[in-house]
From Swiss-Prot:
HAMAP family: NaMN_adenylyltr
Domain of life: Bacteria
The species this protein was found in: Shewanella frigidimarina (strain NCIMB 400)
CDD domains associated with the record: NMNAT (cd02165)
Name of the protein in question: Probable nicotinate-nucleotide adenylyltransferase
Taxonomic classification: Bacteria, Pseudomonadati, Pseudomonadota, Gammaproteobacteria, Alteromonadales
Length: 211
C-alpha cells in the first residue's frame, strides 16, 4: 500500500490538517492517510487538553473520513516523537508498504533542525503541501534539496520506482488557521465550526474543551 503519514499534536485537529491530507491522497493516488498524534511528555505540558481527548478527536475524524486511519505508534511511546525513529519502526513493521511523510513548506525549510533529518529520505518520500504561488528562497539549502529530489506523481507509475527519497509538491488550498487561533476563539465562545469537522465540533462542545 501507499500510505501518507500526517503527524501533529492535533490540539484540536482541524481542516488545516484534514484538507491538505485529502489533497495528498488524491494527487498521489495513495491508499490511506494515517493520522499520527504526537507523544507529549507530561512534564512539558505543551498541550491544552489531555492525550485522551486529542486521541478521541482523531478517532472521530477517522470515523467521519474513511480515507483516514489512526496511527497511535507515537502517542503510546514514552520517548520523544522523533520522526526518523517513528518511520524506522513503521518501515520495519510494514516492509511492503510505501510511506509518504506529509508536511508544509514552513516545516520543510526547518528540516535541517530535525533529529537525523537526512535519514528520512532513506525511509520515505515527502509530500510537500504548498499554497499556490508560494515560493522558497532560491538560496536556501532546502531549495537545493527540493530541486534534487523533486518528482511528479507520474514517477510512481513506474514498477521499478524507489520507495523512498523523493519529494512530491502538492498544490493545496490550505486553511489559514492554526490550532492556537482555534483555541483562542473557542475560549471567547466564537463559532469556529467552519474550520473543524462536524465530529470534532460536537466532541469539543460535549466535553466543554478549550473554555
Amino acid at each position: 500500500m501507499r500510505i501518507g503519514i500526517l503527524g501533529g499534536t492535533f490540539d484540536p485537529i482541524h481542516l488545516g490538517h484534514i484538507n491538505p491530507a485529502l489533497d495528498v491522497k488524491q494527487q498521489l493516488h495513495l491508499d490511506q492517510i494515517w493520522l499520527m498524534p504526537n507523544h507529549i511528555p507530561p512534564h512539558k505540558n505543551t498541550t491544552v487538553v489531555s492525550t485522551h481527548h486529542r486521541l478521541e478527536m482523531v478517532k472521530l475524524v477517522c470515523q467521519q473520513y474513511p480515507e483516514f486511519k489512526l496511527c497511535d505508534i507515537e502517542i503510546n511511546r514514552d520517548t520523544p516523537s522523533y520522526s526518523v525513529t517513528t518511520l524506522t519502526l513503521l518501515t520495519q513493521q510494514y516492509p511492503d508498504d510505501e510511506f509518504f511523510f506529509i508536511m508544509g513548506m514552513d516545516s520543510f525549510v526547518q528540516l535541517p533542525l530535525w533529529y537525523q533529518w537526512q535519514s528520512l529520505f532513506n525511509l520515505c518520500h515527502i509530500a510537500l503541501c504548498q499554497r499556490p504561488g508560494w515560493a522558497m528562497d532560491t538560496n536556501s539549502e532546502m531549495t537545493k534539496e527540493l530541486l534534487f529530489r523533486q518528482a511528479t506523481a507520474d514517477y510512481l507509475d513506474s514498477p521499478s520506482h524507489a520507495k523512498n527519497g523523493r519529494i512530491f509538491t502538492i498544490n493545496s488550498q490550505l486553511v489559514d488557521i492554526s490550532s492556537t487561533e482555534i483555541r483562542q476563539q473557542l475560549a471567547q465562545n466564537i463559532d469556529i465550526s467552519t474550520v473543524l469537522s462536524q465530529t470534532t465540533t460536537e466532541y469539543i462542545r460535549q466535553h466543554q474543551l478549550y473554555r
